[in-house]
Amino acid sequence: GKNIRGEEVYYIGYKPVAKITPKYFDQLPSSFKDIYNNLHNGWVYFASKANGLLPIEDTIVLSDEDWGILEEIDITSLPFKLHNSIGLFDNGMGDYASIDIKSKDEKEGFIWWHTKAPKLNIEIWAVIDEWTKIGIER
């Protein structure tokens, strides 16, 4: 397709997931499992392998990464634990649209910024839609 400047942009949509999935896969909200199982194993901008819902094997558990921002924020005050938090959408700049797999609200998520405190209480699919749109248009 073409972006608003008329330039060609390419996204990759991966085949639905195979049987091998991360141990947290069954704890994902049903909307994500439906996408991964029945439509795509994520979609990303071809050149960067980002700006899209990550293939399930490329999603991250936030506690598995080194985050400099942890020196600046009080993680004990956050309404989630990093080891229960999954980064599902990489914006290509080190930030993730993320969910808490222990949350009872399947529509809620947060943005995990690598340079500032997370933005809480977002509607996860609205952010994924907007970030995908931004990626395609630029």
Please describe what each predicted stretch is.
Residues 1-95:
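A surface-exposed partner-binding patch
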Residues 81, 89-92, 102-138:
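A recognition module on extended beta-rich or small alphabeta surfaces enriched in W/G with H and D/E
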Residues 97-101:
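A short secondary-structure junction signal
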